[in-house]
């Protein structure tokens, strides 16, 4: 938003202009899902600009376009740092547990290389264990070399925000509830024509072993 809104509600978006990123992009789809969940019609109750690539929306907002913008980190915190915008809500919090990142492999590869898949999953689980057992400050210092363009204070702010929002699961088990939520969002946006059975697409065998 362009100003601090401690009492923000999704109804505040009615009649406003919002930079949503490209149609079919995950942020835009999650955003529209939340709007509909709150009784807001994305096509009629507000104006969502889908003409700007998601990587350019922060610059457009900073340049004066729209009343609100949907942003990833570190763009959201960067807008706050330059007093160009304020974070007033989180799509992740209001959407429910959306499985935003997933790893896939062919069934033939899974069957032929279970040890490789298990080692890969175990390594990811170590990362999950680390964020569960360390402070945002400690996490920020470890990941800082991967974000050379962002200063440590900003990284710490971002990690703290993710921490408070319960962004990171304690394990890698892809549960059916989250899978169905993802399909709901895709279906709601018109990007999914036919639902896929959870059992046909997801295996939790490796994640369950890694969690123990």
Where do the model's predicted regions map?
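Conserved C-terminal helix/tail region of periplasmic/extracytoplasmic solute-binding proteins
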Residues: 180-212
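Secondary-structure end/capping motifs
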Residues: 111-192
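Short, mixed-charge aromatic SLiMs
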Residues: 54-57, 149, 205-210
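Pocket-lining segment of extracytoplasmic ligand-binding domains
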Residues: 53-146
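Residue-level signal for threonine
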Residues: 106, 175, 203-205
